[in-house]
Each structure stands twice: as C-alpha cells, then as structure tokens.
Amino acid sequence: MAKEKFARTKVHMNVGTIGHVDHGKTTLSAAITSYCAKKFGDKQLKYDEIDNAPEEKARGITINTRHLEYQSDRRHYAHIDCPGHADYVKNMITGAAQMDGGILVVSAPDGVMPQTKEHLLLARQVGVPSIIVFLNKVDLVDDPELLELVEEEVRDALAGYGFSRETPIVKGSAFKALQDGASPEDAACIEELLAAMDSYFEDPVRDDARPFLLSIEDVYTISGRGTVVTGRIECGVISLNEEVEIVGIKPTKKTVVTGIEMFNKLLDQGIAGDNVGLLLRGVDKKEVERGQVLSKPGSIKPHTKFEAQIYVLSKEEGGRHSPFFQGYRPQFYFRTTDITGTISLPEGVDMVKPGDNTKIIGELIHPIAMDKGLKLAIREGGRTIASGQVTEILL
C-alpha cells in the first residue's frame, strides 16, 4: 500500500512527557492519543504499544524515548514519551534535546520526587523553553488542602530550576481519561491540557536558514530499501536526492538521501524541527551510528579538542559533593552523543568546586561534529555534574 503524503496544515511542534517513574507519563501519553483519535481521527496508541520493548513491558517502565503524534485545534504535535527510570536518563537527555515544550507529570499522592527535580534540571540544561504540569492521580487524594500543598511544592520546584511559577497546572486522572467509555468529566482534563499547550507553549522558531544538520538518534535497516537514520532536524532543510555527509566518530562519508518520512508519511523535504526518518543510498547499517550527524557537505567538521565555558552544579542542585582536578575523565554529552573525555583546567587553577563557573579544555576519545556555541552536559556516575557550551575549537 502506498504511503500517504504528510500535509503541513498546522504548526508542527515537539513536546514530551517528563517526570518521576510511575507517576503516569505513559498513561497520560496514551490518554492524549486516545482523546485526539476520537476528536480528529488520529491514530490511537494503547499504553502497551507505547511501552513497546520486551524489557519495558516486563518491567512496566519506559526505557527508550517513544515518538507519538496527534493534533490539537491549533497544532500538529510530535510527542516524546520520556523514560523516568534513573538508569535511562541518557535517553531522556536526547529526547529532551528535541522538545519545544515539556509536560511534567507529577503524581498527586506522591508529590515532587528526586527524578521530578532531575528531569526539570535536564529540561533546563537542554533548553526546553517552557513546561506545563499535569497533576495526575488526583482522584486518589481526598484532602483539598493536601492538593494545594503539592501544587505549591511543584511551583517551588519549577521556580528553583528557572521555570515560571505561573506555569499552568492541569489536574486529573490519566488512567480514568484513558478508559473506554470515559465520562466527559474524566476526559475534560485532557481537553484542558491540550488547550493549555495550544495557548501557553509559544510557536517554535525554526532555524531553516543555516545549513542542514540532523543529529542521528537511531539507525534501522529496511529490507529491500536500505539504511534509515532517524532524528530531529536541528537546522536547515533537506530535499529528496540531496547529497549529505555523515560526520563524527568514524571517518566522514558522503551519501544521498533517497527517502524522507515523518510518522510513516512521505515528505518531499524535511525542515528544521521535524522528527524524520531519512533513507540513505549505499550505506550499510554498520557504517552509521547514533551520535553522528548528517549535514550539508562541508558545513561541519569532526573535532576532538575544544575550549568550553561550564557551570559546575552545586551539591544542592544534584551535582558533585567534592571538587574535581586536572585530568578528570567524565562523560561528555553533545546532542545525541555521550563520549568519554579528559578535562584540563586553566593555568593557575588546581581544582574546580561545585557551584563554580570556569573555562576548561576538553579532549574526547573520538571526534564528533562540533562547532562554536554547541551546548554540552557533563555527567558522572548517573548524574549531571556540569553544563556549558563550546567557546573555541582547538583540534
């Protein structure tokens, strides 16, 4: 059956659910697609289709970020269901790097939990512009005063990570809204959430003037057709049969884009902000991997050594409890890459303490596509310890 063409009739926006494990992110994602399927005829995804990997089903948790789509009155949304499980924050980082707005899910009976804060911190670091809160499982809280306390706690957490205290907080039960035959009262919270997203999230400004760049998130083989890479177009425009380079980690390789898809619909061109799958000519799956980029030939080069300005998180912000020294070897996160590197400190600086702002020189074990201004996070032992951006390319 021939695939249908993707029609750009509404503003396209990338959003996602973040929050602590078991607070109801995936249930809410399923409830939204269910509501929009009824209202607009979109495809509905059931909970167990979103938690789609065998390990996720067995453990009942989301590990890999999952992309969904639905539409509201104003927009076409691409929705990322982000994992809440601590081991999988790496995927949260790459998922959040694609968000134009975030939906923070907080369970009313539990309130703000450690991962709620970690996800807010990550959202701030990777540049999610604004957050809406869905206060879930409110049917399990009988005391209105307790709900008010949780709401206040959520607003404090938002303000603590640089988001607005006036953020809309939508209250409801995603589980009740998801049930077949949910009453209009039970489904009202989803309608309210979509209306809040349409009005509170600003239309994203797309960077389509700069040369094309897509950060590779996943690689697939489609039998009989070839290798497909998926990811979000960071900037620029890509058209069918255009030449691109695969840059970073391995030697740079040229190829041609022979197919462009978004949510199983065909595109003639992909533009900045689109989550797409690109079919590459003559590329074996082994030759390309997550963390590389596809780019306009000659527009970006791979580098291993750079200068960066970083802020080191304090203990209170979830960072290290002690300083680090010359030769420190953490994990550097750039776009969808995480890679080991060594830190050299400026002359006359012996150590860097939590809470410090400092210049560093980073040297990576593999080259990655890099230019001035690229944002980075530094992580160690499962937590973010610093964030910043590249100020100079050295090698």
Curated annotation (Swiss-Prot):
InterPro entries: EF-Tu_GTP-bd, EF-Tu_GTPase, EFTu-like_2, EFTU_2, G_TR_CS, P-loop_NTPase, Small_GTP-bd, T_Tr_GTP-bd_dom. It comes from Treponema pallidum (strain Nichols). Its main location: cytoplasm. Transmembrane segments: none annotated. Residues 173-175 are annotated as: G5. The keyword Metal-binding applies. It comes from the Bacteria. Pfam families: GTP_EFTU, GTP_EFTU_D2, GTP_EFTU_D3. Residues 19-26 are annotated as: G1. GTP binds at residues 19-26, 81-85, 136-139. Residues 81-84 are annotated as: G3. It is an enzyme of class 3 (hydrolase). It is found in: Cytoplasm. Mg(2+) binds at T26. Keywords: Cytoplasm, Elongation factor, GTP-binding, Hydrolase, Magnesium, Metal-binding, Nucleotide-binding, Protein biosynthesis. This is Elongation factor Tu. PROSITE patterns: G_TR_1, G_TR_2. It catalyses: GTP + H2O = GDP + phosphate + H(+). GTP hydrolase that promotes the GTP-dependent binding of aminoacyl-tRNA to the A-site of ribosomes during protein biosynthesis. Monomer. Belongs to the TRAFAC class translation factor GTPase superfamily. Classic translation factor GTPase family. EF-Tu/EF-1A subfamily.
